[in-house]
């Protein structure tokens, strides 16, 4: 019995490995649009796909980021300035992409732009602190997708949305986790709706990686600003010692982030170039062996594990 079961599992993984190794033809003729290319995953992916001969359309937030990327890549790669929080910027970028791809359409749309800071407890935030997180991570992503979807449909191409392991299990992260849960839901619904048009949607779920977004000093600096602006009754409820411990723990964990960004960009590249891309990619060892397995545990057990791993607020019950 066990022999047959192990054999079946082995054959399944062998078949999956073979299918996923099949590569889309004529990659050199395919256009890929990537948001958030100033640094981090987007920047590395743009260079990676450029080296592979694909036609990369890289969206950067700043002209400085765009210029630095152009200096590191071939003449095939083109850049455009895009602020995903501004509708007029998205409309202009869509027209720019349309002029370049023509009747071929857009093979790949990679929604990579994202923000993390400030990193705090939900009660500490003001609307002006958390709204930008939603505007970039979720609203911007949906608007870019809807605006460019007709170009992707024309190419029967791919949409790759960058979520997070914290979009599968909300251990911490305040509104960052909330925004990434939204990305997961949007991507799942979108995948169902566009599959009849030959469009495939993949979700990338990175663990903890060292990028500008996870810069420890900048994160703590912005977290302190949120705390300082919080009402006095909230500060008294948690206590200064609790906040200091929270900052120390956050900084310590951010310092552990992996520097191997290719673990993420390789997943993105596979989603764009394999004839059989995965629906979800868990990128990073912490995502594969901690966050994702934790998401399958009973909520009561996860709550207990979190409760014993952190300190108590000053006015805890």
Swiss-Prot record:
Residues linked to a glycan: 71, 161
Expression by tissue: Detected in liver.
Organism, as annotated: Mus musculus
GO CC entries: early endosome membrane; endoplasmic reticulum
pH dependence: Optimum pH is 8.5-9.5.
Disulfide bond entries: none
Membrane topology, from the record: Peripheral membrane protein
Gene3D superfamilies recorded: NAD(P)-binding Rossmann-like Domain
Subcellular location, record wording: Microsome membrane; Early endosome membrane
Chain positions recorded as NAD(+) binding sites: 33-57
Reactions that this protein is recorded to catalyse: all-trans-retinol--[retinol-binding protein] + NAD(+) = all-trans-retinal--[retinol-binding protein] + NADH + H(+); all-trans-retinol + NAD(+) = all-trans-retinal + NADH + H(+); androsterone + NAD(+) = 5alpha-androstan-3,17-dione + NADH + H(+); testosterone + NAD(+) = androst-4-ene-3,17-dione + NADH + H(+)
Binding site for substrate: 164
Protein name: 17-beta-hydroxysteroid dehydrogenase type 6
């Amino acid at each position: 019995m066990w022999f047959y079961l192990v054999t079946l599992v082995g054959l399944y993984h062998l078949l999956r490995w073979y299918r996923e190794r099949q590569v889309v033809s004529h990659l050199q003729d395919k256009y890929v649009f990537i948001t958030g290319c100033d640094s981090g995953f987007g920047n590395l992916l743009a260079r990676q796909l450029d080296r592979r001969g694909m036609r990369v359309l890289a969206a950067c937030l700043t002209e400085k980021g765009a210029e630095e990327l152009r200096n590191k890549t071939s003449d095939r790669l083109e850049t455009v300035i895009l602020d995903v929080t501004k509708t007029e910027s998205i409309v202009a970028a869509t027209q720019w992409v349309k002029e370049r791809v023509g009747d071929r359409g857009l093979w790949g749309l990679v929604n990579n732009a994202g923000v993390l800071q400030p990193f705090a407890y939900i009660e500490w935030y003001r609307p002006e602190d958390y709204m930008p997180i939603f505007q970039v991570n979720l609203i911007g992503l949906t608007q870019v997708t809807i605006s460019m979807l007709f170009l992707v449909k024309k190419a029967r191409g791919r949409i790759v949305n960058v979520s997070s392991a914290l979009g599968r299990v909300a251990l911490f992260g305040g509104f960052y986790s909330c925004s990434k849960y939204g990305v997961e839901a949007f991507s799942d619904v979108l995948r169902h709706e566009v599959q009849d048009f030959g469009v495939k949607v993949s979700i990338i779920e990175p663990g903890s990686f060292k990028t500008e977004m996870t810069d420890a000093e900048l994160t703590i600096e912005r977290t302190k600003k949120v705390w300082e602006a919080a009402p006095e009754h909230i500060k008294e409820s948690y206590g200064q010692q609790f906040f200091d411990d929270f900052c120390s723990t956050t900084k310590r964990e951010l310092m552990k982030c992996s520097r191997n960004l290719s673990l993420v960009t390789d997943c993105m590249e596979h989603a764009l170039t394999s004839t059989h891309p995965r629906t979800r990619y868990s990128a990073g060892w912490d995502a594969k062996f901690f966050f994702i397995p934790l998401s399958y545990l009973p909520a009561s057990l996860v709550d207990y594990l979190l409760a014993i791993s952190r300190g108590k607020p000053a006015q805890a019950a």
